[in-house]
A protein has these predicted regions:
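Glycan-recognition and catalytic cores of secretory/periplasmic carbohydrate-active enzymes
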Residues: 1-169
């Protein structure tokens, strides 16, 4: 056995390789290169098409299946959606400036999303998609990039509060 002194883990431990964060850069307010405009347009069209199909065929469901044009919930109960897709898409709705769709998603989270569900949720998926989605939406609504939705301190606090509610469970 190796003898480890009682105070071995006290204080800061130096890293073996010095690590420096890169300097902060502002988010570009316009495409960096001319071909970026075409790519940005293609991304917007693809997202709007996918999001529109989800809203039409599976609104509120956790997952959307485009081939069958149907949705499912991860708990396999229609009455217990957690809204994985809605919350996961919030940051994209904000960045693309899709205000009406953003409002629909925000209102669904306000009116329908409940943590009081019976069943077992995947901790990884819940953390990255729901908790991550709420936290990124909170940060983006506090200080959105230029050309996206207008900042909303109220919405930022709302999403942060919902994230805290989930994290406390």
């Amino acid at each position: 056995p190796v003898d480890i002194p009682d105070n071995f883990y006290d204080g800061e431990r130096p890293t073996t390789v010095p690590f420096q964060l890169p300097p902060a850069r502002k988010i570009p307010t316009h495409p960096i290169q001319e071909q970026d405009k075409e790519k940005l347009h293609a991304i917007r069209v693809a997202f709007q098409s996918s999001w529109g199909a989800y809203k039409l065929n599976a609104w509120g469901m956790d997952e959307y299946h485009p081939l069958s044009k149907s949705g499912t919930n991860l708990l396999l109960k229609d009455e217990s959606p957690v809204g994985f897709t809605i919350v996961d898409a919030l940051d994209t709705l904000i960045i693309l400036g899709m205000e009406e769709d953003y409002m629909d998603a925000r209102n669904w989270i306000r009116d329908e999303l409940s943590w009081d569900v019976d069943g077992r949720l995947n901790v990884f998926e819940t953390t990255i998609r729901i908790l991550g989605g709420l936290l990124s939406a909170s940060a983006l609504m506090l200080d959105p990039p230029a050309g996206t939705l207008r900042a909303s301190h109220e919405d930022s606090i709302f999403f942060l509060t919902r994230a805290q509610e989930l994290a406390a469970r």
